[in-house]
Amino acid sequence: MRAIGIILAGGNNHKMRELSQKRAIAAMPIAGSYRSIDFALSNMSNSHIQKVAVFTQYNARSLNEHLSSSKWWDFGRKQGGLYTFTPTITPDNSFWYQGTADAMYQNLNFLKSSHEPYVVIASGDCVYKLNYNKVLEYHIAKRADITVVCTDVHGEDVTRFGCLKMNEDCRI
């Protein structure tokens, strides 16, 4: 695939207080031997994305330990790899990421140094299976600047998630 992958795995979920006190949400165990970030990593690996960056921040130690061996996802290639980034403390910036856009901005050099024409951004704390090749084909066919993968949410769940309003052509 002609894209790099970015997995956002730095957030703190206040609603999961007890579970997230000692580890990042993306490092939460699922079915015993998996972590929630494994789903995003597997989706990227199965879509043949060769270069993946994981932006970490909150309670990242156990997540970094889990990511320390990229052999499970086959990212250890000569032209690719698995990279982890934490907020950079400099004389000009002594803050954690101030949100998703700031995490992207603080790691802009990684994006600029990549030669792939597309970027796939995924959450590290969602459990799903997705072929990003099909998403990229759709993105190119629609000549879109940005493509967002979303699902219908109804009832009480609406307040728990970000919401999009689309027209009949699926334009946001």
Labelled PLM ranges:
Residues 1-172:
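Unchanged
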